[in-house]
């Protein structure tokens, strides 16, 4: 499995509750925070729903 690094680049203030919960599930709680994840179909769906708030890079 391939690893990726997910970085939160925009604040979650004023976004839908579902998006806040998705960021929390990804382990992102504040702007600039990074987490390393293994790529999976479930993760891809989560990243797609909050793509306007995050940046994704290959690890």
Swiss-Prot record:
Annotated InterPro entries: Ribo_uL30_ferredoxin-like_sf (IPR036919), Ribosomal_uL30_bac-type (IPR005996), Ribosomal_uL30_CS (IPR018038), Ribosomal_uL30_ferredoxin-like (IPR016082)
BP GO terms, sorted: translation
Domain of life: Bacteria
Transmembrane regions listed in the UniProt entry: none
UniProt GO cellular component terms: cytosolic large ribosomal subunit
GO molecular function per UniProt: structural constituent of ribosome
Keywords attached to this entry: Ribonucleoprotein, Ribosomal protein
PROSITE patterns: RIBOSOMAL_L30
Family matches, as Gene3D superfamilies: Ribosomal protein L30, ferredoxin-like fold domain
Pfam families: Ribosomal_L30
Family: Belongs to the universal ribosomal protein uL30 family.
Subunit structure: Part of the 50S ribosomal subunit.
Protein name listed in UniProt: Large ribosomal subunit protein uL30
Organism: Leptospira interrogans serogroup Icterohaemorrhagiae serovar copenhageni (strain Fiocruz L1-130)
Gene that this polypeptide is encoded by: rpmD
């Amino acid at each position: 499995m391939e690893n990726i690094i997910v970085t939160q680049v925009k604040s979650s203030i004023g976004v839908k509750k579902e998006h806040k919960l998705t960021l929390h599930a990804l382990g992102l709680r504040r702007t600039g925070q990074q987490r390393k994840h293994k790529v999976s179909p479930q993760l891809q769906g989560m990243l797609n729903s909050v793509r306007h708030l995050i940046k994704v890079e290959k690890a």
